[in-house]
Regions:
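Membrane-embedded segments
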Residues: 60-141, 163
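Alpha/beta-hydrolase-fold catalytic nucleophile elbow
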Residues: 115, 182-183, 270
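Mobile cap/lid helix-loop segments that gate and shape the active-site cleft of serine hydrolases
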Residues: 189-233, 292
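Short beta-strand/loop motif that positions the catalytic acidic residue
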Residues: 230-232, 237-239, 243
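C-terminal catalytic histidine-bearing segment of alpha/beta-hydrolase fold enzymes
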Residues: 252-256, 260-316
Length: 316
């Protein structure tokens, strides 16, 4: 009996040690994927290929890292809303250009696309602290421009970009008009158990029931669930119910946490939407949803109408 217990303890200990080793060695490769398999770090195309009006922007983050971005304009003199688009964790901003091309047309806006450090033409290596500084540098750049209306800046983040955008929005309540989150996770701590199921017993976010004894090993927790309730600006939550990477329940949890503190929250589901293609499968309804949200809450586009925190208001 004693030998059986010892063997069990050794087995559990071995699993914990193996999990710790995997987490330390590979976590950054799971969270940040600047180069897709079979491709290079460089941009396969630029906005000119799609006949878009754009500017190469070079920035310095507060720690001196050189960053690259594209500022894409609807028209040379367009002073309408500017959307700061923060991408997912894999690939680079060039892989989002087709979606952005349609975004410009449907929403009649400008789009600022930042390459996180370590992505695309930006220097450095990605980390939560570093990317948070990168996003702030991008916003500071926009606020200094004289060719846009700085009262109409909207943050749009998908997946990892949602975590980046939520942090930026919370930290800049007077500069950002609204936030749009699409298929975003509650935290990397919660996603650890999704990617590696055995980790859910030892790693988890603030709402998890596990022991959380290995949370200290996670270098980029991106705990959006812990800050979403502090955001005062209007928030639109877009959830693809066929998301194969981030369980849709994460978006519902984020909405519930935000709506408990913010009456200007909206939750919209797209039954056919997967992690990366909700904008495509959602069709015209997807773009109408965002357009309506912007008309309600972005300076210069506001229409008369009552605000609502109910998911039913836009989820028809």
């Amino acid at each position: 009996m004693v030998s059986y217990v010892n063997a069990l303890l050794y087995g559990v200990g071995g699993i914990v040690v193996a999990g710790m080793a995997l987490l330390v060695a590979f976590q950054d490769r799971l969270v940040y994927v600047p180069v897709l398999p079979g491709l290079t770090k460089s941009y396969p195309i630029n906005p000119a290929r799609l006949r878009l009006i754009y500017e190469d922007v070079w920035l310095r983050s507060s720690d001196g890292v050189k960053l690259h971005a594209w500022f894409i304009k609807l028209l040379p003199d367009c002073r309408g809303p500017t959307i700061m688009f923060f991408q997912e964790n894999a690939g680079n901003i060039a892989h989002r250009l087709e979606m952005v091309r349609i975004m410009l047309q449907k929403l009649q806006c400008n789009v600022f696309m930042l390459s996180y450090r370590g992505y695309g033409a930006s220097d450095g290596y990605p980390s939560q602290h570093g990317i948070t500084m990168d996003a702030q540098a991008a916003l500071d750049h926009l606020m200094q421009r004289t060719d846009i209306d700085t009262s109409q800046i909207i943050v749009f983040g998908r997946s990892l970009g949602g975590a980046v955008g939520a942090a930026l929005t919370k930290n800049n309540p007077e500069k950002i008009s609204a936030l749009i989150l699409e298929n975003t996770f509650t935290s990397i701590l919660d996603m650890a158990g999704v990617l590696l199921p055995f980790l859910k017993w030892v790693i988890g976010g603030s709402t998890a029931k596990g022991l959380k004894i290995m949370n200290f090993l996670v270098r980029s927790p991106w705990s959006t669930i812990d800050i979403i309730g502090q955001i005062k600006q209007p928030i639109l939550f877009i959830s693809g119910l066929q998301d194969e990477m981030v369980p849709p329940i994460h978006m519902k949890m984020l909405y519930a946490k935000a709506a408990a503190h913010n009456k200007q929250c909206y939750f919209v589901e797209f039954p056919s939407g997967m992690h990366m293609d909700t904008w495509l499968t959602g069709g015209d309804r997807y773009w109408r949803t965002i357009q309506h949200f912007m008309e309600q809450h972005v300076s210069g586009r506001k229409h008369d109408g009552s605000n609502s925190r109910s998911s039913d208001s836009q989820s028809s």
